[in-house]
Amino acid sequence: RSLGADCEIVQNEAPFEKATALKMTEQYLFDPLKFLSSLPVEFEIYENTRAIKVDVVNKLVYTGGGCVKAKKIIVATHYPIINPHGNYIMKLRQSTSYTIAVKEKCSQGMWLEERAEGLSVRPFREGTLFGGIDHRTGRIGKYGKFEKLTERVKTQFGSVNITNCWAAQDVMTFDGMPMAGKYAKNLKDIYVVTGFNKWGMTN
């Protein structure tokens, strides 16, 4: 409330067992596909074009189909690809999480369970998206993560019909704040955006 947010503490509204929740009103359920579908009207997008190398002196981006010259370059490749400038390998780590989509409408709102291996719940069309079971990328552990997520969902929400499942890999900063701005002090007109800590669209 000190930040101007309209919020309240609620009991038994969140779709989690014995949950006390912080409820924030007037939130927007953002559909990224609808947003992206409007972008080509404003500028031209070249898909399936892989950036292989960046010439930071001459502002050239080499791709599999040719070379692109620009006045300014923004490196928004999820994980920064220009090395060794910026020393991002020392500033970032990667985290893997999992999502399943189910046919059933299990929640009317968006919820996030703030605990280790907690769930996120998000309505999508006539069904629901469940996410969670995060771990540091490359450290799988003993049990399959999709199976663990499915077990958690069925334990809390009963029998559900799973339609899709996928994994996401996010870039994390050590202080929890995204990085946006100059790629490195010694590089002119080259910028970076990275480290959204799983809050990409929110940022």
What are the functions of these language-model segments?
Residues N12, A51-I52, W166-D170:
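Short, solvent-exposed loop/turn elements at beta->coil junctions and helix N-caps
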Residues L29, I52, V75, Y79-I81, ...:
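Short, glycine-/Ser/Thr-/acidic-enriched flexible segments
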Residues T20-K72, A76:
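Helical element adjacent to the flavin cofactor pocket in flavoenzyme catalytic cores
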Residues E8-Q11, E44-Y46, T163-C165:
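General small-molecule cofactor/ligand-binding pocket signal
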Residues C7-S38, I133-D134, T194:
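Helix-loop-beta segment of a Rossmann-like dinucleotide-binding subdomain
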Residues V54-F124:
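Flavin-dependent oxidoreductases
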Residues E26, R115-A116, R125, T137-I140, ...:
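C-terminal catalytic lobe of FAD-dependent flavoproteins
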